[in-house]
Each structure stands twice: as structure tokens, then as C-alpha cells.
């Protein structure tokens, strides 16, 4: 096989392995992992969830072809002071949340940690309000504690 750039022979394994390692830097997932890009630039700093204080309620218009005002909240994270927008799931879920409430947010579940569906620029969703899950509040199983 003339013209092949790969070394051949009994003792070529080290050279072949190093060559593979060099090429793995062109893979996006490898580069993100090795340079710890998620931990550096993610507002949650690589954690699955984070606590924050609600600054304001906002309505976000959905992308084409849908037409709706999706309810969301602006949240300031406790651990680093960064401000993110978090979607409030469920019918009437925003009614359980007031300004200055403490909420727990998690990723919304979009591809590669990005936004999901017709919500532009929203990467997080609200999971808990004042220590009570939003799901329990909808179903009427628990009352929201007064802080």
C-alpha cells in the first residue's frame, strides 16, 4: 500500500496511538472535556442544579411557527451571582412564584446543554420554589411556605 502515512511493523503501536491522540483534538466533545469548557463557562459551573433568587417574571415569545408567550423568570444564582432566564413549566406555574422567592433550577434538556423547542435562549427550568417541588404545588399536595 504505497503512499500510506501510517507506520507499519511490529513496533509501530506507540506511534499509531500517539497519532490517534493527536487527531482526537479535532473532536468537539474531546476538546470540551480536556479544556474543562463546561465548568469554565456554564453558569451552574458543571453542577446539575443550582439555587437562585427570583428577580422578575418575564414572558418570552416563542419562535416560528409557534405563537405564544412562554412564562419564565430571571434568576440570580446564589453561588456566583450570575443572572439566567429559567422557564416555568406547567399550566399556571408562574402563579406559584413571586419575586424574591428562592428557586432551584436545572437544565431544560436541550441538545448539547442548549435551549429546547421554541424557547430562544432559555437553557434552564424551575424545579423547586422555596424548598417545595413545583410538581407538588400544581397537584395541590403541598402548600408553598411563606418566607
Curated annotation (Swiss-Prot):
Asked if the keyword 4Fe-4S belongs to this entry, the reply reads no
Q: Any signal peptide, and if so, which residues?
A: none
Q: Which GO terms describe its molecular function?
A: rRNA binding; structural constituent of ribosome
Do the record's keywords include Disulfide bond? Answer: no
Q: Pfam families in the record, alphabetically? A: Ribosom_S12_S23
Question: Which InterPro entries does the entry link to?
Answer: NA-bd_OB-fold, Ribosomal_uS12, Ribosomal_uS12_arc, Ribosomal_uS12_euk/arc
The processes (GO biological process) annotated in the record are: translation
Task: Please tell me one Gene Ontology term that the record gives under cellular component.
Answer: small ribosomal subunit
UniProt cross-references to PROSITE patterns, sorted A to Z: RIBOSOMAL_S12 (PS00055)
Q: Which keywords fit this entry according to its UniProt record?
A: Ribonucleoprotein, Ribosomal protein, RNA-binding, rRNA-binding
* NCBIfam families for this protein: PRK04211.1, uS12_E_A
Q: Which family does it belong to?
A: Belongs to the universal ribosomal protein uS12 family.
- Physiological role: With S4 and S5 plays an important role in translational accuracy. Located at the interface of the 30S and 50S subunits.
- Give the matching PANTHER family: 30S RIBOSOMAL PROTEIN S12 FAMILY MEMBER (PTHR11652)
Self-association state and partner proteins as the record states: Part of the 30S ribosomal subunit.
UniProt protein name: Small ribosomal subunit protein uS12
Q: Species lineage, top-down?
A: Archaea, Thermoproteota, Thermoprotei, Sulfolobales, Sulfolobaceae
Name of the gene:
rps12
Amino acid at each position: 500500500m504505497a503512499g500510506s502515512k501510517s507506520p507499519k511493523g511490529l513496533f509501530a503501536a506507540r506511534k499509531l496511538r500517539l497519532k490517534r491522540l493527536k487527531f482526537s483534538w479535532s473532536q468537539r466533545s474531546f476538546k470540551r472535556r480536556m479544556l474543562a469548557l463546561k465548568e469554565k463557562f456554564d453558569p451552574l459551573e458543571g453542577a446539575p442544579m443550582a439555587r437562585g433568587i427570583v428577580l422578575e417574571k418575564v414572558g418570552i415569545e416563542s419562535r416560528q411557527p409557534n405563537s405564544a408567550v412562554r412564562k419564565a423568570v430571571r434568576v440570580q444564582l446564589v453561588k456566583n451571582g450570575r443572572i439566567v432566564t429559567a422557564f416555568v413549566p406547567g399550566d399556571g406555574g408562574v402563579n406559584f412564584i413571586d419575586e424574591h422567592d428562592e428557586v432551584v433550577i436545572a437544565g431544560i434538556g436541550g441538545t448539547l446543554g442548549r435551549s429546547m423547542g421554541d424557547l430562544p435562549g432559555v437553557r434552564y427550568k424551575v424545579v423547586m420554589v422555596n424548598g417545595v417541588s413545583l410538581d407538588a404545588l400544581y397537584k395541590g399536595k403541598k402548600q408553598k411556605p411563606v418566607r
